[in-house]
Amino acid sequence: MKRTIAIVAGGDSSELVVSLRSAQGLYSFIDKERYNLYIVEMEGHRWEVVLPDGSKTPIDRNDFSFMENGEKKQFDFAYITIHGTPGENGILQGYFDLLGIPYSSCNVLVSAMTFNKFTCNQYLKGFGIRVAESLILRKGFEITDEEVINKIGLPCFIKPNAGGSSFGVTKVKTKEDIQPAIEKAFEESDEVMIEAFMKGTEITCGCYKTSDKEVVFPITEVVSANEFFDYGAKYNGESQEITPARLPEDTAERVRLLTSAIYDILGCSGLIRIDYIITEGEKVNLLEINTTPGMTATSFIPQQVRAAGLDIKDVMTDIIENKF
């Protein structure tokens, strides 16, 4: 009997549109001969299932069920592809845990920690992993331009501490731009991370593990036409993405080993993607960890799956079946 899979998309952040694109990607990737697939759209209090005829019907949040043709349908598995709250920060994971519904991503604790960039990076720094110098600023508190310059220096990045797709991120080069950048970041998050700029090559590496296999994908090098890998570079084609990355083999191997190690240190589950920057002397520096990475046809993970010579349908089946 076919399992019924919910591809859960949407969310309550600026990343909603990106998430809906990822849902379409996943719908095309997952094996429809093996699974019954439905896209579930969440936006605030609107939780709806998209039915095969394109109409939408509400989800019963008491048990995450829905009605189709007068029959109550229950989901066997949730593939979470919400980028941002509530799907990337542990909230939705906790809901599914309460209902006993298995899901694709990391658990509550890991999701919450990795969504908090500052906390995650400081935690991993304790394991000897290189990260940029940074500080955290919470809503209601202020920091002077001089403090930023003295503690972090210029240029620097000012970004929402919780968020993705580069919404609210500014590369700050001058003293005059510090406060406007902080205000912009606070529009996306209650906490702002101020991070030292690192000059180097941006790369990203995907990974997943099951009970009987470990897969670390070929690394992608990101060459942005913009100041940094911002929203335009990510989604409007304003970057060159090279897979496999043009790295010395020993550096690439260190990145692959580090990606696998971080997966285990944090206790990740499902597909993750880790962003790094390679600085002078082939030093590998962690930027951030994505536990619900983009899954559009042109996203990094599908690119890396193709470069590895794998079938993305098989990868999706691995992720789902590992939870049963």
Swiss-Prot record:
GO terms for biological process: cell wall organization; peptidoglycan biosynthetic process; regulation of cell shape. Its cofactor is Mg(2+); Mn(2+). This is D-alanine--D-alanine ligase. Its EC number is 6.3.2.4. Keywords: ATP-binding, Cell shape, Cell wall biogenesis/degradation, Cytoplasm, Ligase, Magnesium, Manganese, Metal-binding, Nucleotide-binding, Peptidoglycan synthesis. ATP binds at residues 149-204. Belongs to the D-alanine--D-alanine ligase family. Pfam families: Dala_Dala_lig_C, Dala_Dala_lig_N. Residues 121-321 form the ATP-grasp domain. InterPro entries: ATP-grasp, ATP_grasp_subdomain_1, D-Ala_lig_Van_CS, D_ala_D_ala, Dala_Dala_lig_C, Dala_Dala_lig_N, PreATP-grasp_dom_sf. Mg(2+) 2 binds at E288, N290. One of its GO terms (molecular function) is ATP binding. Mg(2+) 1 binds at D275, E288. It catalyses: 2 D-alanine + ATP = D-alanyl-D-alanine + ADP + phosphate + H(+). It is found in: Cytoplasm. Its main location: cytoplasm. Pathway: Cell wall biogenesis; peptidoglycan biosynthesis. Binds 2 magnesium or manganese ions per subunit. The lineage of its organism: Bacteria, Pseudomonadati, Bacteroidota, Bacteroidia, Bacteroidales. The keyword Ligase applies. Cell wall formation. The keyword Metal-binding applies. GO terms for cellular component: cytoplasm. HAMAP family: Dala_Dala_lig.
